[in-house]
Amino acid sequence: MRYVLLLKGINVGGRNKVVMAELRRAVADLGYDNVETYINSGNLFFDTDKKPAEIVADFHDFFASHYPFVEAFSLLSAEDYATEVGQLPTWWEEDMARKDVLFYTEGMDKAGLMSYVDSLKLGDEVLQISDRAIYWGKYSESSYQQTAYHKKLAKSPFYKQVTIRNGNTFSALSNYLIP
């Protein structure tokens, strides 16, 4: 089965550097097949017959020994990803200043995040909560500083528990997962 592993917080601002070619080789050496990456932000694709729990355990061990600064990641099968794409909100196709997908990371307090997000008073923005992510759209760049996303969520402890991909990257990931 095809999977994507979305790493949090690598190659950002010159910190937590991971060379994608080295990562691909190391993951292939772990026994994963058809290993690919997309851009430098930690989008790792591979094939395996392993169960998700075994994959998560493998990568927790791998990152602890090779890249200890990688503390969080999200694992989705190609099927999971296709389900997410199939459930995109209608507003996702609208012209917006920003669109982000906040993927839940393995082991995070998902219920706590959902409760927190439900309590936010939204500004010039819209969101949809799904099983594996929160889709967040911001209508205007000029009002971005006033959005709940910027003013509240980005400053909350939950922000460190999600890994974020912008709308363009989210769309591009489909090319590696959905035939």
Put a short name on every predicted segment.
Residues 2-41, 45-179:
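Surface-exposed, charge/polar-rich loops and edge strands
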